[in-house]
């Protein structure tokens, strides 16, 4: 018998649905979650496990993963006091939103953006001020600044390069926004390693209201390890840390991060490959009249077709899983797929040419 728990739960849940991935997470060729096509080499995994097996598994990890935070701070050339590590960047998003939002507070979110931003704002009963992007899916910087100030919003969230549009803000535009509003500005740089634009990291010392979010899931190929970071000034970071759940990052994640940062040439090589393949795929697809391609600054590509749902299912029937992002604002009949291995990319091209050529 069904029970009605609505009166006992957070009323915001009535406006939400559980996170899901259309088509699932298993496929012969999986290109739907913006993952790296490259796993860590076995020799590096062995090196990591050789260290990890000597850790005390019966003891809690540190409240905050200080070894991982110092390793990443040293890698970036910044003070460890400006860095906080989390169990994936999604956990850090939860932490930052908890620190910045509550019922009735306003948050500015360009649309379309990463869906978790809206979900978290709704959960916290905040008021969302959405700012549509231009029709070509580029940011409307003037509108972001104007709406933030008009609405007196205290929090702005920017994803650059943006998921799902794959386009970036120029550093000068980030500077304009951060300096032009009286709000905390979160810049989510999950895909920054693939961008033609400079990171906002250079602005951290200049603007005390700037927070940068990073993930190790994309370029560093550590999606299964769940490693994310917030970077900001120590005073603001100490406040953001207050709602963070303790002990969420395990020692294995810390050790893995340290070893991958020591062998960063593996990341450089993978990023170089992805950029080459991105350019190749964009060039191939731009020659197909029935496919519209958008510029990409990430490890994934956005295309528009006449019937995205049909193409999505046709590719799925061929064992190729992409993402149907048609439900996002301004992205009707759009599909998203990350750069895979060369053989996977070739097969995707072949199927798209056959369907739309």
UniProtKB/Swiss-Prot annotation:
Residues bearing PTM N6-(pyridoxal phosphate)lysine: 218
Keyword flag Transferase: yes
Catalytic activity: L-histidinol phosphate + 2-oxoglutarate = 3-(imidazol-4-yl)-2-oxopropyl phosphate + L-glutamate
PROSITE patterns according to UniProt: AA_TRANSFER_CLASS_2
Biological or metabolic pathway of the protein: Amino-acid biosynthesis; L-histidine biosynthesis; L-histidine from 5-phospho-alpha-D-ribose 1-diphosphate: step 7/9
Cofactor requirement: pyridoxal 5'-phosphate
SUPFAM superfamilies, per database record: PLP-dependent transferases (SSF53383)
Coiled coil: none
Pfam families: Aminotran_1_2
Molecular function terms from GO: histidinol-phosphate transaminase activity; pyridoxal phosphate binding
BP-aspect Gene Ontology terms: L-histidine biosynthetic process
UniProtKB keywords: Amino-acid biosynthesis, Aminotransferase, Histidine biosynthesis, Pyridoxal phosphate, Transferase
Record-listed E.C. numbers: 2.6.1.9
Family named by the database record: Belongs to the class-II pyridoxal-phosphate-dependent aminotransferase family. Histidinol-phosphate aminotransferase subfamily.
Assembly description: Homodimer.
Protein name: Histidinol-phosphate aminotransferase
Organism, as annotated: Prosthecochloris aestuarii (strain DSM 271 / SK 413)
